[in-house]
From Swiss-Prot:
Residues 27-53, 103-136, 145-164 have a biased composition (Polar residues). Residues 90-102, 175-215 have a biased composition (Low complexity). One of its GO terms (biological process) is fungal-type cell wall organization. Pfam families: SKN1_KRE6_Sbg1. Residues 1-215 are annotated as: Disordered. This is Beta-glucan synthesis-associated protein SKN1. It is a single-pass type II membrane protein. One of its GO terms (cellular component) is endoplasmic reticulum membrane.
Amino acid sequence: MERDLTYNAPKIKFTDTEGQEEHFYFNRSNNSTNDLTSHDSSSTQLQDANSRRQAPPPPPHNPFSDNSHENSTESLYQSETRFHQPLLHNDSNNSNSSIGNNRQRIPSQQHDTSSLYSASPISTSPLVSNFQSYSDNQDEMTRGKYNQNTNRSSSNYIQHSPTSAGYDRYPLKTQSSIGGSMSRIGLSSSSPSQQQQQHMYDNNSSNRSSYSPDSATDLMVYENGEFSPFGGYPASLFPLSIDEKEPDDYLHNPDPVQDAEYDKNRFLYDLKTMDKKSMNGLIAFIVMFLIAIAIFIILPVFTYTGYNPKAKNFENYEVLTRYSYPRLSAIRTSLIDPDTPEDALFWKSKNGEEWPLVFSDEFNAEGRTFYEGDDQFFTAPDLHYDATKDLEWYDPDAVTTANGTLTLRMDAFKNHGLFYRSGMIQSWNQMCFTQGKLEFSAKLPGYGNITGFWPGLWSMGNLGRPGYLASTEGVWPYTYDSCDAGITPNQSSPDGISYLPGQRLNKCTCPGEAHPNRGVGRGAPEIDALEGEIHGVIGRVSQSLQVAPYDIWYMPNYDFLEIHNSSITLMNTYAGGPFQQAISGVTMLNVTWYEYGDHQHNFQKYGYEYLNDDESGYLRWFVGDNPTFTIYSQALHPNGNVGWRKLPKEPLSLILNFGISNNWAYIDWPSLVFPSTMRVDYVRVYQPKDQINVGCDPTDFPTYDYIQQHLNVYQNVNLTKFEDGGYTFPKHKLIGC
């Protein structure tokens, strides 16, 4: 591809044969170097210059031409035709001109440059450049006429060295006599009509070349003998100079100031010159960034703060406790489970009254977990139950709900240095009740004739947290409202009847001492609906009330106890010990109520019903719908140096656990099966219509404030003494205030 050498070409001075100077500029239109436009618009000067032009002499003979034709210029042209398109024959206005052997190549308008090249076997070099120019008379153009200029003959001829095997790359100049030391390069000029005819002729003849001697030429003057590496142009007039600007100058001519400005404002410059594709990418990135902000920042903020622009109509619900939990996973707003069947909404009491259901949990939701804060009503502790020297570790992982039941699973799984793992849930400080009917439906673990397991369904006063020994010291299992020897350590008896430290929250606590409601004896009594054991080859359940202080020999007044079916129920031979008095009865169980065995595996109901009135109160236990035995409030009358023990008036929390301990029963290790699971179908609580009292912080027996003031003993399971939590036993009147 030929290079356009006239880009940003300088102004060139031309001189005609008479020495008259004319000023021309290279025409930059269409990237062509063929036309030169005169800056002098005077038609008179142009006509005078044309009249002074003379026809050029014939070019010298080229002895190195491969063509035998006498015209060397034509030979040059013919040798070059394989590199260029056919030339036009300019004979439109000068039909009588002498064509003869004086032919010059007329530049093709389809090329940027029109030059003759030597047929060098290696490269081609420009030999002669023919420039076309024409001037228009403005007045004649208006009238539709053109000024036909006479052809300007070129006086620039090239003489080749006879020693060259081909065309010389840097030919010698044959200088004109005009100007002495000046050489002239011919410039051809033709009228617009001639150019039009040349174009028409080019369509008819592609191989014919001719030249009209009438085409005018101008002479470009330059210093004699100046070396030119460009084959005909002097170096001083080469149109491309290092000082001239080109479109690609910014690639190899860095501008420190402009570059610094660009680096400083790179983003703005790139933004201004950004194409459509890049702009779409930027918009997509911004949209994705905003979406990420909304998902990972705004949404979590709204979720954490509970923001909701929509108004909610909250249902009324009963407040169980003022304790604030970190997270409420249960979705219930009622204490009664909506899955509870309608025929279980009422219970017929001992006196024939119908008590409504006030709380239930059917455990029908699959996959419930009971880690701290997971559930609305129950929590599975993560601890070792050291109070009874259990052999298992209670782990929340062992507790879940499946197939409509709560499952407490015991595995031979090493955990915290113990060889067994099992589960417990408790409603301490979450769900409590005072008076009423408590009912569990459960399937006991293992076989009905293999001893070792210790399943339990029971309740305890909310002032003591099961498994936290520091919290139960001095309150379990006290249910006492007197100020006598019963509140003192060991009941002030040297015979070892009691190892208890005394009632911590007694009736006669000194003013200013810590107490939930000073003037009332408080404690954490225990009522067991079920403690499973095996007697011989048959299972049985122990149901009991555990109280303090104790009767002499732990014997209540049995005149106020009633056994309803002596064929299956009898009083327990174990009546208590140094740490508690147990009014207990045992009832035989059916082997079909256990997990394993060659028989049906059914659920059975276990529970109790009680009223805590001092005169007419009672406590009755049940297996199924049948009562087993009943204790009346008069059975706990004053005895020895202690006064009345009360049927529990404390709010009672619920405990469901599956343990194993040598302190409870003989363990038949070879016969036990692991894993074994205790399943609970439901828990239900009924209360008299006029005495509904659900909650862990009732007005007459509050617990919340006291627990908050002594959180250390309720949250640190490793504390075994109340004083270990940083507290002291309150003083009372018997020892002085």
